[in-house]
């Protein structure tokens, strides 16, 4: 067999054309110093802000300070094995975490790695933890309710899908309990919940997971945990990781709810990192960008319109809006809401629920101060029946508090004032609710209806809650069609009201009430 020179040159040309060279250029640097999880690196001239850096031993870090002749990076996890002179490599990637339906029902760390002992998570999708929030054009106004199942919240400070509602209060005032009730209440609604635990004891997080499992809520929940014993860097990125996992559902035309418990600890972790990076401290020793730390996180909770969902899913999902509702938690010191981080988060969110130690200790739980708790956008999202019946509740409580303050100095009260005080006491009593005993729309409407039409005027305050629970059971067994109609339509018809009036009369004359 003979090959002529032309054929040989053609073969060589073809080989050269088809040759694929996978050369990857990566910048390498050298560790100059390692202290408290902060590494200074020389030689990474083209590192990006927030880029992942690879250290020896399969450890990663984040480039945070880009200086003239060095890079300040924070190590994500253990750093004891990193020493001076080690080689550090740029990865050319921003930090990404796993996302997808496979995460639901699992407990993961801030990097999305499973920590619940249930084996690996089989998801191939990842998304960057830092994303730009949806723009004004991509959003849709909040007009669908996100029911928490708590009478005090759903009637007075309603939360809508896509809203950011702050839960603020001192330690041990029931902030986590309110958030967990909201998560448990989403069972069967199709809402995916993400609970982000930041800087908490591992035992507390295990307790939360156990409670969620007991109430069947882990089936629709992802728990992201960055415990108190973990590196400050992981506590700092945990909320962003959780938010990215929630955005996966929002961008596919679904609804998600995320709880950040709590952002005060994230701010402290970020302050620690910033001070170790030698960034200039500001008020309360926090860095200058601590407002941006929370605003860029909370702005990602939004309701996106149909066009945006269609664009994000490449036309797969049409005619559906998606939402991510955020319930950030802030812990105050001795009720000081004018501190730096609380005022920042109050100004970012669409309303706040204030929980007070005095109310909690007085047995009013959830310990919500109705006077200073507000929902700036939730009113438009409230269910019709709750909006109609709950309108007078806040007013009744406000008048009661004012009159109660004056009545301490007055010896004799006129009949009208006395009645108003009694009504206020009953309303206060009925706003109490045990943890994990959430109510659906119809059950809540029933209680509010009974308050509004004066059914509790002859019920002693001490027996009000027992009366409410007995009456609910009575209606459930005798008139289930009324509850079904209210739940289906979100409104109470005249016919339903007449049925309830007759039911109340019959219940009051029955043995159940007398007992």
Curated annotation (Swiss-Prot):
Family as reported in the entry's similarity comment: Belongs to the ATPase alpha/beta chains family.
Biological function: Produces ATP from ADP in the presence of a proton gradient across the membrane. The alpha chain is a regulatory subunit.
Catalytic activity: ATP + H2O + 4 H(+)(in) = ADP + phosphate + 5 H(+)(out)
Gene3D superfamilies found in the cross-reference section: 2.40.30.20, ATP synthase alpha/beta chain, C-terminal domain (1.20.150.20), P-loop containing nucleotide triphosphate hydrolases (3.40.50.300)
Keyword Cell membrane: yes
Protein name: ATP synthase subunit alpha
HAMAP family: ATP_synth_alpha_bact
GO molecular function, a single term: ADP binding
Primary gene name: atpA
Leading EC class: translocase
Localization per Swiss-Prot or TrEMBL: Cell inner membrane
Binding residue positions for ATP: 169-176
EC numbers, comma separated: 7.1.2.2
Membrane-topology descriptor: Peripheral membrane protein
InterPro entries reported for this sequence: ATP_synth_asu-like_sf, ATP_synth_asu_C, ATP_synth_asu_C_sf, ATP_synth_F1_a_nt-bd_dom, ATP_synth_F1_asu, ATPase_a/bsu_AS, ATPase_F1/V1/A1_a/bsu_N, ATPase_F1/V1/A1_a/bsu_N_sf
NCBIfam families, alphabetized: atpA (TIGR00962), PRK13343.1 (NF009884)
Gene Ontology, cellular component aspect: plasma membrane; proton-transporting ATP synthase complex
Pfam families xrefs: ATP-synt_ab (PF00006), ATP-synt_ab_C (PF00306), ATP-synt_ab_N (PF02874)
Summary of subunit composition and partner proteins: F-type ATPases have 2 components, CF(1) - the catalytic core - and CF(0) - the membrane proton channel. CF(1) has five subunits: alpha(3), beta(3), gamma(1), delta(1), epsilon(1). CF(0) has three main subunits: a(1), b(2) and c(9-12). The alpha and beta chains form an alternating ring which encloses part of the gamma chain. CF(1) is attached to CF(0) by a central stalk formed by the gamma and epsilon chains, while a peripheral stalk is formed by the delta and b chains.
UniProt cross-references to PROSITE patterns, sorted A to Z: ATPASE_ALPHA_BETA (PS00152)
Residue(s) at site: Required for activity: 373
This protein's UniProt keywords: ATP synthesis, ATP-binding, Cell inner membrane, Cell membrane, CF(1), Hydrogen ion transport, Ion transport, Membrane, Nucleotide-binding, Translocase, Transport
Domain of life: Bacteria
């Amino acid at each position: 067999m003979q090959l002529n020179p032309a054929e040989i040159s053609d073969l060589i040309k073809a080989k050269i054309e088809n040759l694929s060279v996978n050369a990857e250029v990566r910048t390498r640097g050298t560790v100059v110093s390692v202290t408290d999880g902060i590494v200074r690196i020389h030689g990474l001239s083209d590192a990006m802000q927030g880029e992942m850096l690879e250290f020896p031993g399969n450890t990663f870090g984040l480039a945070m300070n880009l200086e003239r002749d060095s890079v300040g990076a924070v190590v994500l996890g253990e750093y004891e094995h990193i020493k001076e002179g080690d080689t550090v490599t740029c990865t050319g990637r921003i930090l990404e975490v796993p996302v997808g339906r496979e995460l639901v029902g699992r407990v993961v760390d801030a990097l999305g790695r499973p920590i619940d002992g249930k084996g690996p998570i089989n998801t191939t999708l990842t998304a960057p933890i830092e994303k730009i929030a949806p723009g004004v054009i991509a959003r849709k106004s909040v007009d669908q309710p996100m029911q928490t199942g708590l009478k005090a919240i759903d009637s007075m400070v309603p939360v809508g899908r896509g809203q950011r509602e702050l839960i603020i209060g001192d330690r041990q005032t029931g902030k986590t309990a309110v958030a967990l009730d909201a998560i448990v209440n989403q069972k069967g609604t199709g809402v995916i919940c993400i609970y982000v635990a930041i800087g908490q004891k591992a035992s507390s997080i295990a307790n939360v997971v156990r409670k969620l499992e007991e109430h069947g809520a882990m089936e629709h929940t992802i728990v992201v945990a960055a415990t108190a014993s973990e590196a400050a860097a992981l506590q700092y990125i945990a909320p962003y990781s959780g938010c990215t996992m929630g955005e996966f559902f929002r961008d596919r035309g679904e609804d998600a709810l995320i709880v950040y418990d709590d952002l005060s600890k994230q701010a402290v972790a970020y302050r620690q990192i910033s001070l170790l990076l030698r960034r200039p401290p500001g008020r309360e020793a926090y860095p200058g960008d601590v407002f941006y730390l929370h605003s860029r996180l909370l702005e990602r909770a939004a309701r996106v319109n149909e066009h945006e969902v269609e664009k994000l899913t490449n036309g797969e999902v049409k005619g559906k809006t998606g939402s991510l509702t955020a319930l950030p938690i802030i812990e105050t010191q001795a009720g000081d809401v004018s501190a730096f981080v609380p005022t920042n988060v109050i100004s970012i969110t669409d309303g706040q629920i204030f929980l007070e130690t005095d109310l909690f200790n007085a047995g009013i739980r959830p310990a919500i101060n109705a006077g200073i708790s507000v929902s700036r956008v939730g009113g438009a999202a409230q269910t019709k029946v709750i909006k109609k019946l709950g309108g007078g509740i806040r007013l009744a409580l406000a008048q009661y508090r004012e009159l109660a303050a004056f009545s301490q100095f007055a010896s004799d009260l006129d009949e009208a004032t006395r009645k108003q005080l009694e009504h206020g006491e009953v309303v206060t009593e009925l706003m109490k609710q045990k943890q994990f005993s959430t109510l659906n729309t119809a059950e809540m409407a029933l209680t509010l209806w009974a308050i509004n039409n004066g059914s509790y005027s002859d019920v002693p305050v001490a027996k009000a809650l027992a009366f409410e629970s007995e009456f609910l059971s009575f209606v459930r067994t005798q008139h289930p069609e009324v509850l079904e109609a209210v739940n289906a339509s979100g409104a109470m018809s005249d016919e339903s009201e007449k049925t309830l009036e007759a039911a109340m009369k019959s219940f009051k004359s029955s043995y159940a009430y007398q007992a």
